[in-house]
A protein has these predicted regions:
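Terminal peptide-recognition signature
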Residues: 3, 27, 64, 103
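CoA-thioester-processing core
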Residues: 1-17, 29-30, 45-49
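Interdomain hinge/lid region at the active-site interface
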Residues: 95-96, 102
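Structural motif
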Residues: 30-31, 106
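Transmembrane alpha-helical core positions of polytopic small-molecule transporters
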Residues: 17, 93-94
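Acidic, divalent-metal-coordinating active-site segment for phosphoryl/phosphodiester hydrolysis
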Residues: 19-26
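C-terminal long alpha-helix characteristic of the crotonase
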Residues: 24, 33-81, 88-89, 110-114
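Hydrophobic alpha-helical segments typical of transmembrane helices
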Residues: 2, 11, 63, 83-86, ...
């Protein structure tokens, strides 16, 4: 289901019919992966990346993920309407207020996922 949407029908067909191995850098170029980490610094880089995600506004990230998933099936007009609704919801969260205050106070935000 996902592979043709990520890499296109022709490439997905070739990969599935041939069983060819795909190296990480090639998978990244095809859009199958977001990021590839070097073997030498893998654990350090992965933990830094995970820490970055963990310190983001998780409520907003969840809403964004929901919108991305819905966008696969919505019409353009319906998606714009959904995004408007979600924007209003997101703006009422504690994390939104924290983000705005942190920006105005020139400090790093401390999001709570609320």
């Amino acid at each position: 289901f996902f592979l043709p949407r990520l890499v296109g029908f022709q490439r997905a067909t070739a990969l599935m019919m041939t069983g060819d191995k795909v190296m990480a850098t090639e998978a990244q170029q095809m859009g199958m992966l977001y990021k590839v980490f070097a073997d030498e610094t893998f654990m350090t880089d992965v933990l830094a990346f995970a820490n970055t995600l963990a310190n983001m506004p998780t409520k907003a990230m969840g809403l964004t993920k929901r919108l991305l998933n819905e966008s696969l099936f919505n019409t353009h007009d319906k998606q714009l309407a959904r995004e408007g609704i979600i924007q209003v919801d997101a703006a009422s969260t504690s994390d939104y207020a924290e983000g705005v205050n942190a920006f105005l106070e020139k400090r790093k935000p401390e999001f709570k996922g609320k």
